[in-house]
C-alpha cells in the first residue's frame, strides 16, 4: 500500500468503484454483443472475452498478485448502487452459512459449460452474465452484508481457493496497534462522531483483521483498509501457500480441518480442473460414446452426469480415502497418543492438493488465452464495423496468438510448479501432524499428487479443441 502510485490509489476510498466502472461497461457491451451480435462464437465479444481472455487474465493475476478481480467486480458496483434505494433487511440464514450452495453452483456451471457448449454460444454466455447480475441483486437485495460473495458466488469461491497461493494478502502491519485499538473499525465500520452513523463500512465478510489468516473469503474490497483509523492494514507480501500448511483458527472461517464444506470446495476445485480440461480433448468423445452404449443412455446430459459423478465424487472418495487409510496405517497414532480418525485425516490433507489443481487451471486457461491472445483485435474491429463506423479497419481474422508448441512448454511449467507446491504443502502438513514419522504420513499423499500430475500431463499432450476461436486443433 506504500508503493508509489499504487499505494495512494488503493488508500483512496473510491478506488474500488474506479476499477469496477470499466468492467461494468465491458460487461454491458458483452451482453449486448452476445444477444444481438454475430452468432458465431469466434466473432462475438461475449464468448471471446469470457472464455478466452477473462479466464486467462484471472488465473495469471491470482498467481502473480492476488484476488484483484473481486476487488474490481462489476456485479458489486451494481449491488452498491441498488442498495442506495433498497436496504436489505435480513441476515443470511444460519443453516446456510457455509459453502455448500456455492459448491453446488460451481459444479452446475462446469456441467452447463459442457452440456450447452457455452464457449460456442454467445447467446447463452450473455444470459449467464445477466443471470449473475440478477442473482447478486436478489441475494444482496434481501440479505445484509456480502452474503452473495461469501456464500453463493462460484467465481468468488474459485478465487478464494486460488488466492491461497497468491503472493499478496490484505492484513495488519503491526499486531500491537490492533491490540491498543478500542474502536475495531475494521470490522464494525467507522462512525460519524455526532450521529453515530457508519460512514465507512467494515468488513462485510466477517473477517476481523487481527485474527484473519490468509486470503480465504477475502475479496480485497479494502473496506477494512479505509475504515482503519491507524492506517495499519495494507496489501502486504507473504509466502504463497503458507496458509495451507497450518491449521490455526481463522476469523470468519474457523479451522480448515473442521470445514467439510471447504474440503468439498477444494475437491471440486482440484478434480474439476482435470474434468474441465478432459472435456476439450479428443478422448472424451470416445468415453461418452462408450458410456452411452454401455448404459443405453441417449441424451448427453445423462452421460455427462455419469462422468461428473465419477470425477467429482467416486474418484476423490476412492483416492483420498485410500491415502488417508494408508497414512493412518503407516504413521500410527497422533503425537498425543490418540488413534487417527479417517475422515479428519482426509479433510486435513486435501488442502495440499490446491497447488496442483491451480496448476491445471493455469495450464488449461492459459492455453486458450495465449493461443488466442490476439483474436480480440479482429473481433473488436468487426464489432465496431457493424456499427457503420469501421475506423479500426477491416478485421484481421488471421491474427491468433502464441504458437501452441511454446504454450505447451508454459503449461508444463505450471504443472511442475503445481506439483512442487502440493508436495511442499503435504509434507508440511505431515510434519505438523506426525512429527515422529512425517515421511510415512507424507508418502500416500505424494503418490496421489503424482497420479493427478500424470493425469494432467497426459491431458495437455492430447489434441485439444480450440474453443471460441477460428483455429482448429
Question: What residue spans do the PLM features occupy?
Answer:
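Solvent-exposed, extramembrane regions of membrane proteins
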Residues: 190-213, 232
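Membrane-embedded alpha-helical bundles of multi-pass integral membrane proteins
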Residues: 1-185, 201, 207, 225-226, ...
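Conserved short loop/turn motifs at secondary-structure junctions
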Residues: 66, 212-215
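A short, cysteine/histidine-rich metal-binding "knuckle" motif
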Residues: 213, 223-224
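A membrane-cytosol interface segment of integral membrane proteins
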Residues: 217-218, 229
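Alpha-helical membrane segments and immediately flanking helix-loop junctions
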Residues: 190, 221-222
Amino acid at each position: 500500500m506504500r508503493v508509489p502510485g499504487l499505494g495512494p490509489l488503493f488508500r483512496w476510498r473510491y478506488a474500488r468503484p474506479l476499477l469496477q466502472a470499466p468492467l461494468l461497461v465491458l460487461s454491458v457491451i458483452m451482453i449486448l454483443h452476445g444477444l444481438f451480435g454475430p452468432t458465431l462464437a469466434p466473432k462475438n465479444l461475449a464468448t471471446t472475452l469470457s472464455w478466452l481472455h477473462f479466464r486467462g487474465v484471472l488465473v495469471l493475476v491470482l498467481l502473480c498478485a492476488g484476488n484483484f478481480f473481486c476487488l474490481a467486480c462489476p456485479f458489486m458496483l451494481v449491488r452498491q448502487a441498488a442498495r442506495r434505494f433498497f436496504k436489505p433487511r435480513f441476515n443470511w440464514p444460519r443453516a446456510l452459512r457455509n459453502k455448500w450452495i456455492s459448491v453446488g453452483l460451481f459444479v452446475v456451471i462446469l456441467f452447463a459449460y459442457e452440456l450447452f457448449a457455452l464457449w460456442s454460444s454467445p447467446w447463452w454466455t450473455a444470459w449467464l452474465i445477466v443471470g449473475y447480475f440478477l442473482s447478486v441483486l436478489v441475494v444482496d437485495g434481501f440479505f445484509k452484508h456480502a452474503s452473495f460473495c461469501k456464500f453463493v458466488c462460484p467465481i468468488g469461491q474459485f478465487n478464494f481457493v486460488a488466492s491461497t497461493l497468491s503472493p499478496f494478502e490484505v492484513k495488519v502491519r503491526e499486531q500491537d496497534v490492533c491490540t491498543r485499538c478500542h474502536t475495531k473499525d475494521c470490522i464494525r465500520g467507522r462512525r460519524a462522531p455526532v450521529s453515530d452513523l457508519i460512514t465507512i463500512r467494515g468488513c462485510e465478510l466477517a473477517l476481523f483483521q487481527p485474527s484473519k489468516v490468509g486470503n480465504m473469503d477475502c475479496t480485497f474490497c479494502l473496506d477494512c483498509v479505509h475504515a482503519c483509523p491507524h492506517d495499519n492494514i495494507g496489501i502486504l507480501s507473504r509466502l504463497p501457500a503458507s496458509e495451507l500448511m497450518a491449521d490455526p483458527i481463522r476469523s470468519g472461517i474457523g479451522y480448515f480441518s473442521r470445514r467439510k464444506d471447504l474440503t468439498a470446495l477444494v475437491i471440486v476445485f482440484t478434480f474439476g480442473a482435470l474434468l474441465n480440461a478432459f472435456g476439450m480433448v479428443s478422448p472424451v468423445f470416445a468415453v461418452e460414446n462408450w458410456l452411452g452404449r454401455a448404459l443405453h443412455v441417449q441424451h448427453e446430459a445423462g452421460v455427462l452426469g455419469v462422468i461428473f459423478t465419477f470425477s467429482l465424487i467416486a474418484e476423490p472418495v476412492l483416492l483420498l480415502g485410500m491415502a488417508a487409510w494408508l497414512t493412518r496405517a503407516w504413521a500410527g497414532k497422533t503425537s498425543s497418543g490418540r488413534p487417527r480418525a479417517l475422515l479428519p485425516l482426509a479433510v486435513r490433507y486435501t488442502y495440499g492438493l490446491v497447488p496442483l489443481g491451480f496448476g491445471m487451471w493455469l495450464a488449461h486457461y492459459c492455453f486458450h488465452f495465449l493461443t488466442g491472445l490476439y483474436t480480440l483485435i479482429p473481433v473488436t474491429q468487426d464489432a465496431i464495423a457493424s456499427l457503420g463506423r469501421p475506423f479500426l479497419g477491416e478485421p484481421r481474422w488471421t491474427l491468433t496468438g502464441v504458437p501452441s508448441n511454446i504454450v505447451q512448454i508454459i503449461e508444463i511449467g505450471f504443472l511442475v510448479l503445481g506439483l512442487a507446491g502440493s508436495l511442499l504443502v503435504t509434507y508440511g502438513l505431515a510434519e505438523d501432524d506426525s512429527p515422529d514419522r512425517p515421511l510415512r504420513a507424507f508418502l500416500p499423499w505424494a503418490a496421489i499428487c503424482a497420479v493427478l500430475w500424470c493425469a494432467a500431463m497426459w491431458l495437455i499432450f492430447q489434441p485439444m479443441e480450440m474453443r471460441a476461436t477460428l483455429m482448429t486443433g
